[in-house]
Structures are given as C-alpha cells and as structure tokens.
Amino acid sequence: MSLTRRDLSFLLPALATAASGQETAKKEKPVLAAKAYEYSELPVKTNGENQSRAVFDGLTHTGYPVELHMTRLAPGQRSHPPHKHVNEEVMMLLRGQVDALYGGKTTRVTAGSTVYMASMEEHNWTNPGPEPAEYFVIALGPKT
C-alpha cells in the first residue's frame, strides 16, 4: 500500500496530537513549591524488612526533575539488584553503614557520608549490619 501526499496530510494532525500527548505525559510532574514534609506523615512502603518513604517527585522552577526518598535498610539487606539509569543520584547516609557498589568496586561508608552516583553507573547499596542503615536519596534529572 502506498500513501499519497494527500493521505499523509490527513495523518499529520493525528501524529502531531500523539507527539504532544507524549510531551504532556513527560510534563505531568508538578513544579515543586516550598513545603515542609513531616516525617511522621510520609506514607511507609514496606519491602520485606526494608522501608522507604517517598518525600517528593517533581520539577524545579526551571523544569528540572528532582525526586527525594528515604530508606531504612535492614542488616544484611540490599537496596535492589545492581542496576543503572540515566538520572544521577546523591545518597546521604544518616545512620548505620552501607557498602556502596559503583564503578565495579564496593566502598564502605558510615553515618554522615555521601555517595554521588553518575548517570549510567551500575550501583546498589548493601547494609553489612549489625544495625539498620537509614539514608536519603536525591535523584536528579530525567529517568529515561
């Protein structure tokens, strides 16, 4: 089946609508306003012995994606299997210790430490114990 220019002219508005729909889907995150997030009011998501709290997921005033979550990682547990993604992450360890995997090596960090994870860097966090580890992760940039 061959398409004429006339056929294509009928398809153009549909393609434009579909493309704008994709742009709208990408921009559904809200622009974040100044706000205090009370720890006790954040919903808790449980995954086995681990817990996480989503704090916010939105856009800065310039449209830059930013997301913050908190995790309580039980002794001997890992955050997730090693993986990589486009966005960058900053992990700030509040309590405990974590073995941070990145760049093909593992580095043990203690409370008060920060780990920066570059785009497309395979990573994960493991709690060597004996106490729970609590940390914040700030994800910067688009996830895809």
Describe the predicted segments one by one.
Residues 66-69, 114:
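Aromatic/pi-system hotspot detector in well-structured domains
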Residues 78-80, 99, 115, 119-125:
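Histidine-centered metal-chelating micro-motifs
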Residues 69-84:
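Conserved short histidine dyad/triad with adjacent acidic residue
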Residues 86-88, 92-98:
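Glycine- and acidic-residue-biased ligand/ion/polar-headgroup-sensing regions
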Residues 105-119:
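Short acidic-glycine-tyrosine-enriched beta hairpin
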Residues 3-7, 11-65:
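A short, N-terminal "cap"/entry segment at the start of jelly-roll beta-barrel domains
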Residues 119-144:
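Ligand-binding loop in jelly-roll beta-barrel domains
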